[in-house]
A protein has these predicted regions:
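Small-residue-rich hydrophobic transmembrane alpha-helices
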Residues: 1-51, 55, 91-102, 106
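Alpha-helical transmembrane segments of multi-pass membrane proteins
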Residues: 2-4, 68-94, 120
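Transmembrane helix-loop junctions in multipass membrane proteins, especially transporters and channels
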Residues: 14, 58-67, 97, 101-104, ...
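Residue-level recognition of transmembrane alpha-helices
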Residues: 42, 78-81, 85, 111-112, ...
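Short membrane-interface helical motifs at transmembrane helix boundaries
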Residues: 48-75
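Membrane-embedded alpha-helical transmembrane segments of multi-pass integral membrane proteins
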Residues: 49, 88-91, 145-149
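Membrane-interface helix-loop junctions in multi-pass transport and translocation proteins
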Residues: 72, 115-148, 152, 156-163
């Protein structure tokens, strides 16, 4: 799963660089168009990664263990991870875009809001004894909360400031 995060983080780095360059050149309209294109690439790459992970879920866990109890827990968790990937692709891109735009203050506040959503979900999993798959489902709630806060910011356009 860390390997997927590294691949998605590469999209964030590209988003930072391209956004900084485009806004630095004073091209707000081009930056917005570039952002939409990168969001599509993020969703597409995340979707492809999710499908690959989904197709390989029964085999991936076997690379690490033969213990039947671990395999029984791992495969549904890997499926949950796979479902999250398309959302994660867009989240990573928008993180990069907003970092490249110098919108760190918004990202900090959005992070607190996301934590306010995720913490009860994660604690609830532990309290209810939900197990590994439900912990990944809770993490999906974290990703969804991040996606919503980032898309709201992308749509309002206040991040696209030249000369910042």
């Amino acid at each position: 799963m860390t390997l997927l995060a590294f691949a998605l983080d590469a999209l964030a780095i590209a988003g930072q660089t391209l956004t900084g360059r485009s806004l630095g050149a004073g091209d707000v309209v081009g930056t917005r168009a570039l952002t939409r294109r990168m969001m599509a690439w993020g969703a597409g790459f995340g979707g492809a990664a999710g499908l690959l992970l989904l197709a390989s879920a029964p085999f991936v866990a076997r690379l690490f263990t033969t213990d039947p109890a671990v395999l029984d827990a791992a495969v549904p968790a890997i499926v949950a991870i796979a479902v999250i990937q398309p959302l994660s692709g867009v989240v990573f891109v928008l993180d990069g875009v907003l970092i490249g735009a110098g919108d760190g203050a918004y990202l900090a506040w959005a992070g607190l809001l996301t934590l306010a959503v995720y913490a009860p979900l994660a604690v609830g999993v532990g309290w209810a004894g939900g197990g590994l798959t439900w912990l990944w489902v809770a993490y999906g709630g974290f990703i969804l909360a991040r996606l919503l806060t980032l898309v709201v910011r992308e749509r309002d356009g206040r991040w696209a400031v030249t000369g910042a």
